[in-house]
Structures are given as C-alpha cells and as structure tokens.
Amino acid sequence: MLPRRAYANSVFINCPFDAAHRTLHYALVFAVYDCGSIPRSAQEVVDAGEVRIDKILRLIRESKFGIHDISLTEADTRTGLPRFNMPLELGLFLGAKAFGRGKQRQKGTLVLERRRYLYQRYCSDIAGQDIS
C-alpha cells in the first residue's frame, strides 16, 4: 500500500517522458520535491491493469497543482502526426478546475511552452492564459 498523498501537496507533472526530454522531466521532479511537494505522473505504477486515461484522470483528481509542458505539439518527423497528449491532459486538468466541486476548484496550473506565443497558433482557446 502506498502512503496516503495529500491533495494540497500533490503536483501532476504532464510532460514528455522520451529520452530527449528526460532532463526536463528530472528537473521538474527535483524542483517539486525540493519545494516540499509530491510529484505525480502517469509513470506511477499502482495498478498495472489500470487503463492509462483512467490513471491520468485519477492523478488529476488527486493533485491540487499541475505543470504542463505543451511544447511537443509539432508534427513527429517520422510519422508526420502531431502529439496532442500534453494539451489533452492540460484540458482535462483545466476542466477539473472549471467543472469540479470543492477542492477541485482550487487547482493551480503552470503551462510551459518552448517559444513564446506559439501555443496561440494551435491552441487559441487558452490565449488568455499566462504561459511560461
């Protein structure tokens, strides 16, 4: 049994897990720990039979804060397809804040993007957000 995690100290980290972005992922995990909080991500294994989207929804529900790196929405060089996992998870997090009840409405979000204002070209609905 895993230790009980406090909602107020849990930070959902939504960033790429591939080798090219491993340094960023480790830096985010370190920074969250260093601030006294608990990093949470889809890489957690509590139940290997849990469907991935259900795991993500559970982690969002259990986390007051979220860090979302949406910088990988460009087309993949091998497939030509964009990666929309990170914007999708950001949308789920923002939806939990907007439509949730009680503590869900207290969620705080940090959104990261590589180039300033690039997100407005592919995700204009968050154009009013402060993106770092």
Task: Provide a role label for each language-model segment.
Residues 77-132:
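Cross-kingdom TIR/SEFIR domain
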